Amino acid sequence: MIFKILFLFLLANSNALSNKNPEYIIKKTDDQFREINNYQVDMVISIAIPAFRMPKKKYKVYFKQPDKIKVKSRGFGLLPKTGMFTSPLENFSNLSNIRFSKDLSRTNPNEIMLVGDLVLDSLALDVPNEYARLTFKPTVDVKVDTQNWVITQVLTKIDTVKIMEINNFYDVVDDSFYMPIRSTVEYYVKDARLSKWINKDIGTIMGNNHNMNIESDMVKGLISVNYAKYRVNRGIKDSIFED
């Protein structure tokens, strides 16, 4: 009887959110993102790729709404800004045909998943011809925590084959703000077009003095990002963002 009541509760909660449209979910996550007016944070990024090693990269990041970003680092290497600091609304604009997932295996009542078709132009991929463009159709599953209105997982795949999975882990920081404390990006790439794009992205983090000569079209690895020493909504001078 207890399990039946629990099942009915989960079903009712899921139906309540499903009665909303995807735009409602996106707006709620975007509103939550914009409640953070500014912050600074220390970030450590490590990359693990088979047969390749590199030291951890440390960054200090300053962010101020709506789109001011300043990244400081020692030595070579740049932190890709797209995706990490852009709003959910902007990130969702890289998807088309956004709808609710039909996957009914989830049991967390504070969770919902959206599915969208990835807009290839957002990847800056070199697609050789129109036929390749028509047959190359990645989809993206976005898992949203509907209690805190944050994105916890982004899974990119072609058919049922995973090519990239991002997981975000959150906690309360600086007394009262729910922010990511760790993110992981796992690659499972067998497609030459995507491997070249990912090689370029990883090379950017490492710095231009590093050459990503991975001989295979296969890129399989893990990028880990740890966040620490948050200072949230304490104000940041505009001069910080001047070059």
Residue positions per predicted region:
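Extended beta-sheet lipid-handling architectures
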Residues: V41-M43, M54-K60, P66, V71-S73, ...
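An acidic-aromatic
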Residues: A48-D117
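Short loop/turn positions at the edges of beta-strands in beta-sheet-rich folds
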Residues: E35, F63-Q65, N148
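Short, charged, low-hydrophobicity "junction" segments
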Residues: N13, L17-S18, T82-R99, V154-M164
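Gly/Pro-enriched, hydrophobic low-complexity segments
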Residues: P109-S239
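Sec-dependent signal peptide recognition
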Residues: M1-L8
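N-terminal leader/targeting segments and the immediate start of mature chains
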Residues: L8-A51, K102-S105, E242
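A residue-level signal for beta-strand positions that form part of recognition/binding surfaces
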Residues: L8, N38, K68, E111-M113, ...
